Amino acid sequence: MMCNKHSKNYYKKYKKWCDDYFYLHHRNEPRGIGVIFFDYKKENWDKDFAFVRDVGIVFSYLFKEIIAKKIKKRWKKKDKLIQNKKRGRYVEFNLLHDRGTKFGLQTGGNVEAILMSLPPTANWE
């Protein structure tokens, strides 16, 4: 595992951070696929850079593999419903919990720019 190359504690630490940060408390459900999350790494610049670089390299490789595997998959109506439900969960998280969104809205930021990441369609059940 790439994280272990840098520290035996990184995967466990950043997986927990991901699970905790991206949890929808009002629904009692996790978001995402359970990978890692971190921000504001300020331990050692060179080591932090090497770790972030390796995360990017691994992500790029894995993303290409996923796309290659799924690129020819035909979408069904059921798939679109699932996608829009997940988009709805993203909207909930972004507006209720995301630190960046909250900060931008509370400090008079450009609302259109802040909300630009919201999906064009979403569903709630």
Segments (PLM) and residue ranges:
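A domain-level signal for the structural core that forms small-molecule/cofactor-binding pockets
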Residues: M1-E125
